[in-house]
Design a protein with these regions (language model features):
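Charged, low-complexity helical/coil segments in non-catalytic cytosolic or luminal regions
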Residues: 56, 100-297, 318-319, 323, ...
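Short Cys/His-rich micro-motifs in 6-15 aa windows
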Residues: 25-32, 86-94
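Short cysteine-rich clusters marking metal-coordination/redox-active sites
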Residues: 3-6, 21-24, 64-67, 82-85
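Extended hydrophobic
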Residues: 281-332, 356-359, 363
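Short cysteine/histidine-rich zinc-coordinating motifs and their immediately flanking basic loops
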Residues: 15-20, 33-39, 75-81, 94-100
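Hydrophobic alpha-helical transmembrane segments
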Residues: 341-352
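Short, flexible, mixed-charge glycine/proline-rich loop motifs
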Residues: 9-15, 51-59, 70-77
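Cys/His-rich metal-chelating microdomains
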Residues: 7-9, 27, 69-70, 88
Length: 382
């Protein structure tokens, strides 16, 4: 969007939920939907016929040559850094075919500064990481990006048959009685979520910070994307629905059968499902991404742009791990020898502490010598 004062580009401001001019600082407040307003679903069949492709604003598609991620940017942007790998990317002048347009989103509401503070607060509790990582300024530049997600709603008719077990307790024993059961269940599938990014569909780090409910969503607002990159979905609507049925629907159907039969377990369960009134939402979910540089490696960081929930990969302190193992082994060895030394059990703890201190001193001396040798090897010869 162009500024009414100077004609420069306006970008989304996380702190104010509005637009700010990059040149003159003019601001425009965006309209917030009433709290509790739910975003409706879109018809699945209509989307498969090509309807619902208007994003309300032109976007340009670019694929990072380093990591392969596909992203959508504002047309005014000429170059950017990839939010996923940090590589420099140059945008082409052609507008993109963006496919199906989103109808819901969660706008960024947590600022970069807030995420940074939260990260260093989390990091202090990373006991198993090296002290320099826990207490040092290791967090790289945080980059915002919207990640694509699909949600599905449908009316399901489940026809099932199988053997269902009912467990009863008789004293200390349990007995399971099996009965053949069959039936038809009518059930509503509500807001079943599938990640639309092939890159992150199985990424535990990202998925741990992107959970949301229907009450978190607002109708898609093009202005909230101003200056913000969005990853292009690489798992399309049809594929996402097939994945939901093939990989995730079995547990949901099994729970429905248990609820209908009140059974405790099952055997040889067979079922078929018919779905009606299938609808979807295409949701843009905000995420802050960064990397922590430590020991020549980069450890990924992800945080929710909605509630600040965060997670990251961390290095493991070998010294701490070895020390803990050594203490455990020392206590075990002392426990074995105490009967032969005619020592009272009360001496076990002091002896374990002494053994630990001796071992720690030897370990630190060895580690110091090793580091000195490595430093000497790096020094250039005269």
């Amino acid at each position: 969007m162009k500024c009414n004062n100077c004609g420069s580009t306006m970008t989304y401001d996380v702190a104010s939920y509005g637009l700010v001019c990059d040149h003159c600082g003019a601001k425009k407040q965006l309209h917030k939907p009433e709290e509790g307003t739910l975003v409706g679903e879109m018809d699945f069949a209509s989307a498969m016929r090509g309807a619902g492709t208007n994003w309300g604003v032109s976007r340009r598609l670019v694929t990072c040559k380093s990591c392969g991620a596909s992203m959508l940017f504002d047309p005014e942007q000429m170059s950017e850094l990839c939010p996923f790998c940090g590589s420099a990317i140059v945008l082409t002048p052609e507008e993109a075919d963006c496919g199906i347009a989103p109808n819901a989103m969660i706008p960024f509401s947590i600022t970069k500064e807030e995420v940074t503070k939260k990260f260093y607060r989390w990091n202090k509790f990373a006991f198993w990481s090296p002290e320099k990582f826990r207490k040092g300024k290791v967090l790289g530049n945080l980059t915002p990006i919207y990640i694509p997600y699909w949600t599905f709603d449908a009316d399901a008719v489940i026809t099932y048959s199988g053997e269902f077990g009912y467990t009863t307790e008789i004293g200390e024993d349990t007995k399971t009685t099996w009965h053949k059961r069959s039936g038809i269940i009518e059930k509503h599938l509500d807001d079943h979520t599938v990640c639309g990014s092939r890159k992150f569909a199985n990424d535990k780090l990202l998925n741990s910070v992107t959970s949301f409910t229907a009450r978190d969503l607002i109708p898609y607002t093009p202005d909230a994307l101003a200056g913000m990159p969005a990853e292009m979905y690489t798992i399309g609507l049809d594929e996402a629905w097939k994945n939901a049925q093939n990989e995730q629907m079995g547990k949901w159907i099994t729970r429905a059968c248990y609820g209908d039969t009140t059974a405790d377990c099952h055997n040889n369960l067979n079922y078929s499902v018919e779905f009606h009134n299938l609808a979807y939402r295409y949701v843009l979910v905000p995420v802050w991404l960064a990397g922590c540089k430590y020991g020549g490696k980069i450890y990924n960081v992800a945080a929710s742009g909605h509630n600040g929930t965060g997670n990251c990969h961390r290095p493991l302190s070998v010294a701490k791990l070895v020390t803990v193992i050594a203490v455990i082994m020392a206590c075990m060895i002392l426990g074995m020898f105490i009967p032969y030394l005619n020592l009272v059990p009360a001496l076990a703890v002091p002896l374990a502490i002494v053994a630990f201190v001796i071992y720690l001193a030897m370990f630190m001396k060895t580690l110091s010598e090793q580091r000195a040798e490595e430093a000497a090897k790096k020094e250039p010869e005269p």
